[in-house]
Amino acid sequence: MGYDRASYTDVEPRAPGMHFLRDALGSEALGVTVVEADDGWEGMEHDHADGDHEEVYLLLTGSASLTVDGETVAMDAGDAVRVDPASTRTLTFDADDSRMVIAGAP
């Protein structure tokens, strides 16, 4: 079979509201995460310099802020932001019922 299929709702969150789909899809290079969160949800500050992979954050619904190397980028539904591997980032949701897809790969 040339594809794999998974529903994020069938994947146990590894952190509150975070559904990591890489294993469920059998993906070797691309990580995909769905985040469902309410106002005030904040992710941990991190970077991906060791893995040398960039990430794209796509906000589907709600409102969020992505702080990249100390600069805050406000996001509305439909906005996408790409972040360099070495950049430090922190994600914060600013509205209830927000949903985001994060994809990352080398």
Where do the model's predicted regions map?
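Short, conserved beta-strand element in jelly-roll/cupin
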Residues: 35-37, 49-66
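Short acidic-glycine-tyrosine-enriched beta hairpin
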Residues: 69-86
